[in-house]
Amino acid sequence: MTFKKSFDCYDFYDRAKVGEKCTQDDWDLMKIPMKAMELKQKYGLDFKGEFVPTDRDMMEKLFQAGFEMLLECGIYCTDTHRIVKYTEDEIWDAINNVQKEFTLGTGRDAVNVRKRSVGDKRKPIVQGGPTGSPISEDVFMPVHMSYALEKEVDTIVNGVMTSVRGKPPVPKSPYEVLAAKTETRLIKQACAMAGRPGMAVOGPETSLSAQGNISADCAGGMQSTDSHEVSQLNELKIDLDAIAVIAHYNANSDIIMDEQMPIFGGYAGGIEETTIVDVATHINAFVMSNASWHLDGPVHIRWGSTNTRETLTIAGWACATISEFTDMLSGNQYYPCAGPGTEMCLLEASAQSITDTASGREILSGVASAKGVVTDKTTGMEARMMGEVARATAGAEITEINKILDKLVALYEKNYASAPAGKTFQECYDVKTVTPTEEYMQIYDGARKKLEELGLVF
């Protein structure tokens, strides 16, 4: 039976009030892992150690498994403890009517985001920034300016303000609202100081409540041509605060960036199972949120990193599959184990940039160095590496890319437990001139040389 109308966030809210009852433990510990395991077996999924897939038939099976995961499981609402189900026609309606391209930013700083494919010769868009990492109030502008000064960077992804007017931005407090507005206002000033006043940003990152996120759309703050973030919950879950934010974004005609980081080794399970959930999550972004693009980020449950062998494989297969069988636009976010000013951090980011570029990602978003959890440990140099490596990777043969990745990951994967902490922005840069130290430049050159030895041509 055909659907009455295209599905939207208001339909989601209504169904979240009347859907099938389920405890969160049953959802997390039974429904998600059992269905993912069942679908892996049903479709015979085996990625055979490839980072970026070369088997189109296996990719098609993965797409079918991800579609079926979303159709049969639905989405769990954590507020009502009910399951929201879509019909098959509603899902296809969303897939068939996605935004095929959009513009971020204004004036000469605007960039056009268009679909890429596996092995595409065009470099993806580089969204450089702290990626939700905590940043001190006193260096908030120079940290973001360090990204805007890099020509490899096309747009900015915001950091989190640890304080505003010296006070913590407690959720649902006046300070959260102020921080949500101030976050983007300061970043746009930083971009203007770098000579790029029309650069788009992606956020807000500081606020955790619906009122905080909605308040970020303001004079001098988030504009409709910026990427507006809303986050799904692990795995295939959402709360009603997020649905309210989605309603605002759609009513405001904002570019919507639907974000979620599937956890390898978590509720979904292993590599293939987590990738099935990742594909389902991609599709849900466009059904539930009416997203302009989906920001991915498979993360390792033990290491908290997106750059491990397992998470790179999940990211590569999920993106290549989405790229091959839909027009949905996808990005990926970067969380290395090592901190800034270290060779390991740059190599980790490079491995993910190679994977994302080769598998058809439209947007690379990072780098949240030191796992994105240490204050002020992120700089524009990591984003430069992400961009330069993407440029070197674009158009390369996938079989060669997989060989390079195997060797590259082997250089750092034994060091996760003892990853170098690195240095803060203040130690990596001259804060007044917003330029990297000679020491960091030498480390950067050393990492670049290693990548050249592995086969990348800059």
From Swiss-Prot:
InterPro entries: MtmB_MeTrfase, MtmB_sf. The keyword Ribosomal protein does not apply. Pfam families: MtmB. Transmembrane segments: none annotated. The keyword Hydrolase does not apply. Coiled coil: none annotated. It comes from the Archaea. Pathway: One-carbon metabolism; methanogenesis from methylamine. Its EC number is 2.1.1.248. GO terms for biological process: methanogenesis; methylation. Keywords: Methanogenesis, Methyltransferase, Pyrrolysine, Transferase. It catalyses: Co(I)-[methylamine-specific corrinoid protein] + methylamine + H(+) = methyl-Co(III)-[methylamine-specific corrinoid protein] + NH4(+). GO terms for molecular function: monomethylamine methyltransferase activity. Can form a complex with MtmC. Belongs to the monomethylamine methyltransferase family. Catalyzes the transfer of the methyl group from monomethylamine to the corrinoid cofactor of MtmC. This is Monomethylamine methyltransferase MtmB2. The gene is mtmB2.
